[in-house]
């Protein structure tokens, strides 16, 4: 039996795979792992989003995969270019944890995880891509792996608990 190939997505990266290849990203704390897929075509794209808005970039060229407001649409385009059908696309999300406690005076700026999740969902809604499952928030880091053949997203938390959505 042949081993299934796994493509790794690094921080602020996005990639697309076709089954039987699976796609994985590690180290999701406040970052969000976004999977956009077409189950009928057994293909999926994943982005490892770090921050909510590209307006936070400091000059130069913006890495689209790094920011929720640019990554979702760019990932959607990659999935369609690989053969995905816009009307059939669905999304799954994981991450967006609040990894550290801050005093209430730090306000909204320190809610990076929650703001990442909110912006990813806003962009998916704008593109009419339904979120069919999610495992977001909390205080634990996650590693996720998506199998485009089965449509299952496996989530391993820092405590080694594994969940499938």
UniProtKB/Swiss-Prot annotation:
Gene Ontology biological process terms in this record: chemotaxis
Catalytic activity, as annotated: L-glutaminyl-[protein] + H2O = L-glutamyl-[protein] + NH4(+)
- Where is the signal peptide, in residue numbers? none
- Keywords of this protein's UniProt record, alphabetized? Chemotaxis, Hydrolase
EC code(s) of this entry:
3.5.1.44
**Which family is it part of?**
Belongs to the CheD family.
Q: Known SUPFAM superfamilies for this protein?
A: CNF1/YfiH-like putative cysteine hydrolases
Q: Which GO terms describe its molecular function?
A: protein-glutamine glutaminase activity
The enzyme's main class, written as a single word, is hydrolase
Name of the protein this chain belongs to: Probable chemoreceptor glutamine deamidase CheD
Free-text function comment from the UniProt entry: Probably deamidates glutamine residues to glutamate on methyl-accepting chemotaxis receptors (MCPs), playing an important role in chemotaxis.
Highest taxon of source: Bacteria
């Amino acid at each position: 039996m042949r081993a299934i190939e796994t493509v790794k997505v690094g921080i602020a990266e996005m990639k697309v795979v076709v089954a039987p290849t699976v796609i994985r990203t590690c180290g999701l704390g406040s970052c969000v792992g976004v999977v956009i897929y077409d189950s009928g075509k057994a293909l999926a794209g994943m982005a490892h989003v770090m921050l909510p808005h590209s307006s936070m970039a400091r000059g130069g060229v913006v890495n689209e995969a790094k920011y929720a407001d640019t990554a979702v649409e760019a990932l959607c385009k990659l999935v369609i270019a690989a053969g995905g059908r816009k009307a059939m696309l669905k999304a799954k999300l994981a991450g967006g944890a609040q990894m550290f406690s801050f005093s209430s005076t730090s306000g909204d700026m320190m809610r990076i995880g929650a703001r990442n999740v909110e912006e990813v969902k806003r962009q998916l809604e704008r593109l009419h891509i339904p979120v069919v499952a999610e495992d977001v928030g909390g205080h634990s880091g996650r590693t996720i792996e998506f199998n485009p053949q089965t449509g299952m997203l496996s989530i391993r938390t820092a405590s080694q608990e594994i969940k499938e959505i």
